[in-house]
C-alpha cells in the first residue's frame, strides 16, 4: 500500500518501522468551524506550563493587570506567562493542574473585568529589518513554547539551531485519533501559517523547508496549497496516515530518510522541527506583538453534544469549556486531557487549560470500551513490532517492574516517545506507557539526588582545600614574621653565636665511660678544689685591703683626730649608760626591799632607758662616722659635722629623759605581785648589763 502511495508522489518519502492504524475518529470535530470561547468568571494561570523552571513573579494579589501583561519573567528555558485578559489578581496560591499526578502547583487567579483591555502593543510590520537576536528575544518574551505537546521553549530551540540547520520541517501530521486542532487551524489560518514559516526561514536560513501533513486532511492540504501558490521555497509533503507519524523522529525519517541516533535530537543531523500551532504563535508574537495567551483546543467525544475546536484563553477551567460543548456527565466520569493513546485522565474538571493542552476528550461509557484487568505478559512480541522507536517494550516493562534502573536506561528507555502503540496492541491489557512514565520519573529523581550529592561533595572538597590553603598561608606568614630581623638584631645574634662557638671550643671534652667501669671523677674534684682555692684567695685579698684602709686612716692626722673624738664620745656614752644601769639596779633593789609594785615599775623604767641609750649610741656613732668622712675630706666640713653631732646627741638625751618620765608615770599601773616584780627586776638587770656590753664591747 505504501509503495502504491509513493508511486503517485513527485517527491520521495520514506517509511519508519512499527506503527499502528487505530480508528481516526476525527470527523466529529474537523468539519465544524472554530468557535471563540467567552471569558470565564475566573482564570487560573499556572506559572509553569513548559519544559523548564517557572519564572519569577512580577505581580501580587490585589493588583490590576492588562491583557498580555507579563505575570512572570525569566531567561533561557524559563518561559514567562501573561495575563489572558484584563482584570484583578484575586489570589496567588496552589491549584490542581493538568498533570497525571494531580498535584497542586502555584497559580495566579485572575477575575476578568470584562473590558479585555490590551497592554501597549508595538507591532513589527517588517520583521526583516530586525536582527536575529531581537527576533529571538521577542519570541521568548511572548512566552512561546512548543504547542505540539512537548512544551519545549521555542526561543531556546531556535537559538540552538541558528547554525548548522539544513532542513526545517513544519509538523502538520496531527496523527493521534480525535485531535483536529491543527487541522482546523490550517483550514482557517493558512496564511498565518505560511507567514510564520517565513519568519523561521529568515531566522534559521535552512537549505530547504518541508511541511509534512497526513493524507486524511484534504481541506487543510487544499488551504495550504492555495497559500503557497507562487512560492517555490516551501515544499508541501503529503504522507500516508499512520500512527505515530507525527513524532519528531518518525516524521524526520519519513521526509528526509535520516534516522536520529539514540539519545540525540533531530538537530544533531541538521533538522529542526516546529508544530503548526507554534508557527502561528510565532507570527502573532513577532508581527502583532501578541504573547501566547490563547490556543486552539479540540473538544470531542460522544459525551459532548456539540464537539468542535475552540479558541480558549490560557487558564480557562476544563469544566467551563465542556459546558460550552454540551457536556453530559458519565458514570463513572472520564475526561481525558490529550488523545486516547498519549493522554491521561484528569483528576479534577477544575484544572485549567495550559499551553500544551490540545484536546479534551469526553468519551461515552461505550465509546472507549470496558476496562479489562491487567494480565501477565505472554511474551508475544507484538509490542516490539508496533514500537516506532525500535525499542524492546517487553524488556523495558520487566526492568521497570523490577526497578532495575540502570538496565532500563541502557535499553534506551528515554528514547520512548510514549505514543502508546505497544499498550494498544498488548493482548494482556498491560498499561506499558504508565510503567515507562513511572520509571522515567524515578530515574530522574535518582539523577537529581546524585547531582545534589555530587554538588555537596564538591562544595565540601572545595571547603577542605580552602582551609588547607589558609593553613599553609598562616604557617608561611608565621615563618616570615619569625625570620624578620633588623640589622642590629642580626649583629647581636651573630655576636652571641660567635661567643657560644668560642666557649664550645674551649670547653672540656665530653667524658666517655666504658660499660662496666666506674667513672673517674678526679678531674672534676681537682677543678672544684681549684675554684675553692681561688675563692679563699679573693677573700684574703679583700681582708687585707680593708686592714690597709684602716691603717691609712690612722696615719692621717685629720682622720686620727676624728677617730679620737669618736672614741671619747663612745666612752662618755658608755659611762652614762653604766651610771644609768647602776642607778636602775640600786633603785630596783630598794624598790624590791620596800615595795614589790615599785620594783616592777623600776624594772620597766630600766628597760626603756636601756633601749633608748642603745638607740642614742647608734645615732651618735653614725653621726660621728659621717663627720669623720667629711673631716677626712675638709677640716671645715669636719668642724660642721662635729657641731651637728653634738646637737643630735643633746636631742637624743632629751628624748631619753622624756621616755624615762613616761615610764615612771606608767609604773603605777603595775599589778601587785611580789614574785612577778622580783622576776621583772632580775630580767631588767640582765638586759641592762647586756645593753652596756653591746655599747662598749672593749
Curated annotation (Swiss-Prot):
Q: How does it sit in the membrane?
A: Peripheral membrane protein
Keywords, A to Z? Answer: 4Fe-4S, Cell inner membrane, Cell membrane, Electron transport, Iron, Iron-sulfur, Membrane, Metal-binding, Repeat, Translocase, Transport
Q: Which residues bind [4Fe-4S] cluster 1?
A: 377, 380, 383, 426
Q: Give the matching PANTHER family.
A: ION-TRANSLOCATING OXIDOREDUCTASE COMPLEX SUBUNIT C
Q: How does it assemble?
A: The complex is composed of six subunits: RnfA, RnfB, RnfC, RnfD, RnfE and RnfG.
A GO molecular function held by the record: 4 iron, 4 sulfur cluster binding
Which cofactors are named for this entry?
[4Fe-4S] cluster
Please report the name of this protein according to its UniProt entry.
Ion-translocating oxidoreductase complex subunit C
What gene does this protein come from?
A: rnfC
> Organism, per UniProt?
Yersinia pseudotuberculosis serotype O:1b (strain IP 31758)
